[in-house]
Amino acid sequence: MDWMWLLSGACIVFTLGMFSSGLSDLRVMVAQRSVENIQYLPFLTTDLNNLGWFYYGYLKGDGTLMIVNVIGASLQSLYMGAYLLYSPERRYVGSQVLVSLGVLLLGYCYFTLWILDLNSRLNQLGLFCSVFTISMYLSPLADLAQIIRSKSTKCLSFPLTVATFLTSSSWVLYGLVQSDLYITVPNFPGIVTSLVRFWLFSQFPPDPPTYRLLQA
C-alpha cells in the first residue's frame, strides 16, 4: 500500500533527523579539537540500541528497521570516533567501548547459538530492545526535574524535542500497523517525554537573544 510506504519513509526521515542532531557536537569537537561539555555515554548507548534493533529487523526481515538502524549505528560510531580522537581520557573511553563490544558479542552468541527457535529469538530480542529503548527515553527525567526547579530550558533543544516527538509518533503508528508491540510500546515514552518538554518550553520559554546596539 502507498500509505505504508509513506509511513516507512516518515520513520526513516524523522529517525535519521533525530540521529543527525549529533552532527552539531561533531562540528564542535572537530572545530575546537576538544570534547568539553559533550557527553560520551549517549553516543555509546544509542549505538548499542541501533545494533540491537538492526539485528531484530534482520531476523524479522524488516527493511525499514534495518535501514534506519544501520545508518544510525554508523553515525554514532562516527561521533564516538571523533570523541576518542579528541578526548583526554582516551584510554578510559576506549575501555568502555571494548567492554560494550564484549557484551554485544556475548549477546549475539546467546541469541544466535543458544536460542535456536526463530520466534523465541525474536520475542526475547524484541523484549530486550524494548526495555533498553524505554530506559533511554526515561533517562532524562532527572534533568527535566532540574529544569522545573531552575525554571530554565536553556539546556533543552527545541528542534531535538520536535524530532523526538515525530520519530516516536511515527514508530508507534508503524508498530500498530505491523501489529508489533515491541516497536509500539517502547516509543510511547518518547511521545510522553516530548510532550513534557513542550510543556516546559511553554512554561519557561528560553530567553530571547540580546543584541548590542551599534554606536554611530
From Swiss-Prot:
Disulphide bonds in the chain: none
Family, as annotated: Belongs to the SWEET sugar transporter family.
Entry keywords, A to Z: Cell membrane, Golgi apparatus, Membrane, Repeat, Sugar transport, Transmembrane, Transmembrane helix, Transport
Compartments, as annotated in UniProt: Golgi apparatus membrane; Cell membrane
Signal peptide from the UniProt entry: none
Main location: Golgi
Start and end residues of each MtN3/slv domain: 6-90, 124-206
GO molecular-function terms, A-Z: sugar transmembrane transporter activity
Organism phylogeny: Eukaryota, Metazoa, Chordata, Craniata, Vertebrata
Transmembrane intervals: 3-23, 36-56, 65-85, 96-116, 125-145, 157-177, 181-201
Pfam families assigned to the protein according to its UniProt record, in alphabetical order: MtN3_slv
GO biological process, one term: carbohydrate transport
This protein's name: Sugar transporter SWEET1
Function recorded in the entry: Mediates sugar transport across membranes.
